[in-house]
Amino acid sequence: MAQFAYTPQAWATLIQTPQDRAAASDTLLRHFGGRLIGLYYTPGAEYDGFALFEAPSDATAAAVEIADIALGHLRSNRLLRVLSAEEMRAALQQAAAAPNIAPKAAG
């Protein structure tokens, strides 16, 4: 998932020429072997919106974000790794097997 915030100039362009940014995002993702699941806007929040997408790898997701940022229409951006419920359950099971390395009390 990527959270994004547009520059003031990007907003001005979108107001003057409303356009489907989901299609543009999907085009970029498909170039890298990914796909857009959804593009959502969050007016009034820290970020203007977020894109939920799939990419072949974490490195590819980073490449998509770098390519998007380089276009100059984003003021800020944050890439987040989203886990499914199944992935989270597997992570919890792995964590349960971790050794206890907590500091020990004197005594």
For each feature predicted by the language model, list its residue ranges.
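Short beta-strand-to-loop capping motifs
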Residues: F4-Y6, A51-P56
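An amphipathic, aromatic/His-enriched active-site/gating alpha helix that lines ligand/cofactor pockets
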Residues: E54-E86
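Short S/T/G/P-rich N-terminal loop/turn motif that feeds into the first structured element of a domain
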Residues: M1-H31, R35-I37, Y41-Y47, A85-G107
